[in-house]
Amino acid sequence: MSETLLYSGKAKDLFSTDDPEVLKMIYKDQATALNGKRKEQITGKGEVNYEISKLIFAYLSQQGIETHLIKNVSETEQLVKKVTIIPLEVVLRNVVAGSFARKFGQPLGQRLEQPIIEYYYKNDALDDPAINISQATALKLVTPTEVATIEAMTKQINTLLIKLFNEIGIDLIDFKLEFGRYQGRLILADEFSPDNCRLWDQKTHSSLDKDVFRQNKGDLVTVYETVLQRLTKMIGGFANV
């Protein structure tokens, strides 16, 4: 198989394959914070992120959410559909945490009356600034129709994952999604792992996500493996793709 590196990100690399419509995605043993300014190699992180995202994407697919995942290849590699990524990070918040708490001076852990969706322009040179829909459409990053689809899919994913994580004793605090255009429709791309969501244990209220790395609160891989073990018991059968 002929492979060329097309993109090297903070947590994953993308390679071409012999099929122009298919890419290989490889999860890396790298943790980052401060929008990539702090980096650290952590053995085993790529594999555990791969395993968690594999389970979540398979589960969402079974629930009717189309994703870019085609096939799991190895312990850190997947074949995915070649999409045109919409350059927006879509953040949904169920509970006050992170930058939302700091920006608005709200108490950490306060449950929001309804989920809040925020958008950030995917541009490393600009440090991924917050952007509203009027700005995003004016810059032709996305169309109004696509925004409606993105918001509907994001809310549906939130409903599904709140229920799933609740069943394994975890609160879904917030998460980030990315979407791509594929054959005239929008599909879920990127990954879903503790790298791009906040998860709190319902009994201890401890972080089960990348805040462990950001705040130096413990061993990242051990924490991620806790999430993986609980998910595997609940939805391990969905991942046979």
From Swiss-Prot:
Record's catalysed reaction(s): 5-amino-1-(5-phospho-D-ribosyl)imidazole-4-carboxylate + L-aspartate + ATP = (2S)-2-[5-amino-1-(5-phospho-beta-D-ribosyl)imidazole-4-carboxamido]succinate + ADP + phosphate + 2 H(+)
PROSITE patterns per the UniProt record, alphabetical: SAICAR_SYNTHETASE_1, SAICAR_SYNTHETASE_2
Residues making up the signal peptide according to the UniProt record: none
InterPro entries, alphabetized: SAICAR_synt/ADE2_N, SAICAR_synt_PurC, SAICAR_synth, SAICAR_synthetase, SAICAR_synthetase_CS
Secreted is among the record's keywords: no
Class of the enzyme per the UniProt entry, highest EC level: ligase
GO biological process, one term: 'de novo' IMP biosynthetic process
Top-level taxon of origin: Bacteria
EC number per UniProt: 6.3.2.6
Pathway named in the protein's UniProt entry: Purine metabolism; IMP biosynthesis via de novo pathway; 5-amino-1-(5-phospho-D-ribosyl)imidazole-4-carboxamide from 5-amino-1-(5-phospho-D-ribosyl)imidazole-4-carboxylate: step 1/2
Listed GO MF terms: ATP binding; phosphoribosylaminoimidazolesuccinocarboxamide synthase activity
Keywords (A to Z) from UniProt: ATP-binding, Ligase, Nucleotide-binding, Purine biosynthesis
UniProt family annotation: Belongs to the SAICAR synthetase family.
HAMAP family: SAICAR_synth
Protein name (record): Phosphoribosylaminoimidazole-succinocarboxamide synthase
